Amino acid sequence: MTVDTLARLCTAVRGKVLVNEPLAGHTSLKVGGPADYFAIPADLADLEELIKVVRSLSLPYFIIGGGFNVLVGDGGFRGVAISLKELNGMESPSRGRIRAEAGATNQQLVNYATGKELTGLEFLSCIPGTIGGALSVNAGAHGQSTMEQVETLITMRDGRIFENEGRKRNFGYRYLELEPGEIVVAAVFSLSEGKAEAIGEKLESYRRHRLESQKIGYPNAGSFFKNPEGQQAWRLIDEAGFRGFQVGGAQVSEIHTNFLVNRGGASAADFITLAGMIKQKVLERSGILLQEEVRILDEYEQK
């Protein structure tokens, strides 16, 4: 960190720039060391200018939304963590369409769509975090995925905005192909008209299901591993004997074995060690190598 670097960042951003900001307070697992710089751009134009300056300074950076799909190492991040929480606008440019910025939460989008009696996004009520995060990994639930509902995907690369038809992007299970440095900043969703009562019933059904199967009670990142094709990660983990297993403050949930939880005082190293043990044992038993759904970010990784 240098005074000149901080001055350049502060000049570039109309929002906030924090120094040595602990990332544990910005992630759902409540672990992670400090980022050298934590920038909160005020809007999309602010983000464009920030990215240009960060790149000109050759600083590593990463985007953080709701912090639900990331595990930051205990050493923190030697670069700039960029929060999109102020990029949270939503509008309906025409009937059946909603444009949502990446920093809006999934629940805010569901509420907005419900208020306009538009259906197709109810499943997002089951997924914590932000629209940007859901799009970046093509998050899904109940047989639906986020990108399937996208008419236009709006991204930023090298400080420039690009718009693409959603159906022309390469995406699949928990995956959206993005170019190096490409950031999802917004999307236009194409939805169907629905009845308020039917939408409400579906939301209530999803809420009950989540309470019954995922009432975890401790900080977590949601599903830690992707489901292998034709398999369920939780079952493989359970059959390997990890239900309730604990390393330091990190534990495999006794309620849902694909959730790793912070029972208090956990370190990022605890989670990384536990995840490694799970992967090794499952591989030995089943021949299947589990892949993390959670992004593990160490202090030297560059975006």
UniProtKB/Swiss-Prot annotation:
Domain FAD-binding PCMH-type: 30-194
Cofactor list: FAD
Pathway: Cell wall biogenesis; peptidoglycan biosynthesis
Molecular function GO terms recorded: FAD binding; UDP-N-acetylmuramate dehydrogenase activity
Pfam families listed in its UniProt record: FAD_binding_4, MurB_C
Major place of residence: cytoplasm
Top enzyme class: oxidoreductase
This protein's UniProt keywords: Cell cycle, Cell division, Cell shape, Cell wall biogenesis/degradation, Cytoplasm, FAD, Flavoprotein, NADP, Oxidoreductase, Peptidoglycan synthesis
GO cellular component: cytosol
Active-site residues, Swiss-Prot/TrEMBL: 174, 223 (proton donor), 293
Subcellular location: Cytoplasm
EC number: 1.3.1.98
InterPro entries assigned to the protein according to its UniProt record, in alphabetical order: FAD-bd_PCMH (IPR016166), FAD-bd_PCMH-like_sf (IPR036318), FAD-bd_PCMH_sub1 (IPR016167), FAD-bd_PCMH_sub2 (IPR016169), MurB (IPR003170), MurB_C (IPR011601), MurB_C_sf (IPR036635), Oxid_FAD_bind_N (IPR006094)
Cytoplasm as UniProt keyword: yes
Catalytic activity: UDP-N-acetyl-alpha-D-muramate + NADP(+) = UDP-N-acetyl-3-O-(1-carboxyvinyl)-alpha-D-glucosamine + NADPH + H(+)
Any single GO BP term: cell wall organization
Protein origin, superkingdom: Bacteria
HAMAP family named among the record's database cross-references: MurB
Function recorded in the entry: Cell wall formation.
Family membership noted in the UniProt record: Belongs to the MurB family.
Protein name: UDP-N-acetylenolpyruvoylglucosamine reductase
Species: Geotalea daltonii (strain DSM 22248 / JCM 15807 / FRC-32)
Organism taxonomic ancestry: Bacteria, Pseudomonadati, Thermodesulfobacteriota, Desulfuromonadia, Geobacterales
GN (gene name): murB
